[in-house]
Amino acid sequence: MVNPQKINHFGKLEMAFEPRRGYTRLVHVYQQPPLKASRELYEGSDPTATVFLMESSGGMVAGDRNEINVKLASGSRVRLKQQSALKIYPSHTGDHCTQAITVEMADEARLEWLPEVTIPFERAKFQADTTIRMKESSTLIWGEIVAPGREMRGEVFDYQAYQSKYKVYVEEQLIAFDSIHFKPQEMNFAALGLLEKALYIGSLWIVSPLVKNLNMRDLQDLIQQEQSLQASVTKLTDQAIHCRWLAKEQRTLHKEINRMFEQMTALL
């Protein structure tokens, strides 16, 4: 159990990747607890560097802050995986805990951020800010899932506040801005146009020069294979699409968003 009286953490993780001798290498890393990155892992001759992101404190509490900065040099291929769900503990002081992620991608770089779950506990307050800056020739596949709380313990939208901002810039032009601001005590999530009967939200962002070759009707059919989910695909620009799911339970959503993630990595 996290001690609510603990000293606030300021986690910091800086990573820089570049191709060397046929593989993408993690050439610079700065780690400030509780954030930590694994060494690079590879699958056979695939030059993609897979790195696991770890949070050793077991979760974030009021006043904690995590900063993650990622830089990909030209031609880098990187897959980042969170080791576990991000747990947001109750705010006993009334302060938010915050997470800021900044990514810079050079020409023909490729980043895959695999989806993991953010779980805001009862009375939690959380703010997240993610900013991606990339080139027209680079590729981004990014997934994330937001839970209503510890559902198995009966915590469903019992947190105080959840706020996230997600921005993608291509050649310094803003092509995507997604803002979520939930205050369960002030909102009726069952209302038409909000979550209605859904509990979980899943998102997948795909930005690539190859998006223009994808058929939107085929993607719509692909994303709607699981009847228990509500899902849709939106074309943002000729090189960007956004997929969103609303789900009643986590396991099916996780399975479907990962299936779509792997489909996109294969197509792009």
From Swiss-Prot:
UniProt KW keywords: Chaperone, Cytoplasm, Nickel insertion
Cellular component, GO annotation: cytoplasm
Annotated localization: Cytoplasm
Superkingdom, taxonomy of origin: Bacteria
GO MF annotations, alphabetized: nickel cation binding
Main location: cytoplasm
InterPro entries: UreD
Role this protein plays: Required for maturation of urease via the functional incorporation of the urease nickel metallocenter.
Subunit annotation: UreD, UreF and UreG form a complex that acts as a GTP-hydrolysis-dependent molecular chaperone, activating the urease apoprotein by helping to assemble the nickel containing metallocenter of UreC. The UreE protein probably delivers the nickel.
Family designation: Belongs to the UreD family.
Protein name in the entry: Urease accessory protein UreD
Organism the protein comes from: Lysinibacillus sphaericus (strain C3-41)
